Amino acid sequence: MEARIDEKGKFFTPRITKDAITAFVRTANKIIVGSVYVRPGNRLTDELNNDPSSFLPITDVRVYDAEDERFQFQSSFILAAYREILLISELDALATIRDVPWNAPSAEPTPLIREDDNLGVHINERGKYFTVRTPKDAVLCAVRGGDLAVLGYLYVRPDWRLKDELNDDQARYLPMTDARVFRVSNNMLLYHASFLLIGRHAIDIVAPIDAVTGVSNVPWLPIRSTEGEG
């Protein structure tokens, strides 16, 4: 068994060359900011949906409480259970809509893996953003899961229904663009991402906006009022 062992234990070393992407990970109770690893030529979507393992390795990690965003701990390496990951995005894909602690300069950890380290890792400053590799239709949807609601565009193959995309067992995470994430209990806008991945296991309801009727007073379910129309 080959392992890198030093006074801090076993560190993570990719067995094949991968790109390091700074990621934002949201679980029910935690916010995790750190580096995840993607094979060259793969998108983050491809990497997560094709990984047969149960845990995602993350390095250079900062962990915050999801409720009050208070810093909890920092680690050079953790493993996050896929079943607990609700949302995951490249950090650079998040718009700055408010001050958050993980964007503070003092929050930057000392990197475990640096550009001059020979660990089979490429450091990408911006990572890989979402590109549709097969023609798909963008469908504006509201997605509910627990106390989170996400409004944004899901993608459906032209000869598929939305139901078919959601029932695709190969899609552990569903890509969404122009995604706004709200806390349902107070309708607060938490994050706005040009691209994020939603854990299929965490979804309670998916509602295409065009299919919703009635009047809504919540920001994550915008419904065109029919009042005054003949």
Per-region residue spans from a language model:
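Conserved RNA-binding domains used in RNP assembly and mRNA/RNA metabolism
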Residues: M1-G230
